């Protein structure tokens, strides 16, 4: 019986926190939404500074639900390193950006994941002249990757599991990692498959 009571109280605390956030949003007059620093199709500011993409549209939908006006939203571009801290500190009200939902994150961050809006997988980009047809052929390769991501962890785990040598070249943003790859600073670039296609 004590266990069930604890779960109910924990649930009540989470509802109270959500109500407190909603009250703060209503008092402020807009939703502060954390988004990716720039990922085509998900969250990217165009040449006029207008944010576009599925993650941005979700932010607009929340604003429409709260205020009846999808324009009552402001965007805070966040790196992978910044995203959870920004949400925990109240810098943003919601986080709508590419974020892998893991059991560790679900249980240790004190945040509520509300659902999945896109399923993705990790991939690699290599130059054709490297002659690589499989990730198993990347032993000893230098790989550009964004730090603080499950992509970085998965990369290390994959190389370790296959007894391969890895030379990670880490960057704060995916844009920086992609640019370094384009400049030839890495043999390969890894991120979500959607990011490779963008």
Where are these regions (language model features)?
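N-terminal signal peptide c-region/cleavage motif recognized by signal peptidases
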Residues: 12-15
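Short glycine-rich His-centered loop
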Residues: 29-54
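Alpha-to-beta junction loops
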Residues: 31-32, 68-71, 88-97, 141-144, ...
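Short coil/turn segments
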Residues: 38, 47-48, 100-101, 127-131, ...
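Ligand-binding cleft/hinge of the Venus flytrap
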Residues: 45-48, 60-71, 113-115, 151-170
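Acidic, polar ligand-binding/catalytic clefts
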Residues: 60, 64, 68, 72-137
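Short beta-strand-to-loop elements that line the ligand-binding cleft
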Residues: 71-79, 145, 164-174
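A ligand-binding cleft/hinge motif common to bilobed small-molecule-binding domains
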Residues: 82, 98-108, 154-161, 180-198
């Amino acid at each position: 019986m004590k266990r069930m009571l604890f779960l109910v109280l924990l649930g009540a605390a989470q509802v109270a926190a959500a109500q407190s956030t909603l009250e703060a949003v209503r008092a402020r007059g807009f939703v502060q939404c954390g988004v990716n620093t720039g990922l085509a199709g998900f969250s990217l500011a165009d040449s006029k500074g207008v944010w576009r993409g599925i993650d941005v549209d979700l932010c607009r939908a929340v604003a429409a639900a709260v205020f009846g006006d999808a324009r009552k939203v402001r965007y805070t571009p966040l790196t992978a390193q910044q995203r959870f801290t920004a949400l925990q500190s109240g810098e943003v009200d919601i986080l709508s950006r590419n974020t892998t939902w893991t059991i560790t994150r679900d249980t240790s961050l004190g945040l509520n994941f509300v659902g999945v809006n896109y399923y993705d997988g990790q991939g690699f980009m290599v130059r054709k002249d490297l002659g690589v047809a499989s990730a198993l052929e990347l032993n000893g390769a230098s790989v550009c990757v964004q730090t603080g991501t499950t992509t970085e962890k998965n990369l290390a785990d994959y190389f370790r599991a296959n007894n391969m040598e890895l030379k990670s070249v880490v960057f704060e943003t995916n844009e920086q990692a992609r640019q370094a790859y384009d400049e030839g600073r890495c043999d390969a670039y890894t991120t979500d498959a959607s990011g490779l296609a963008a």
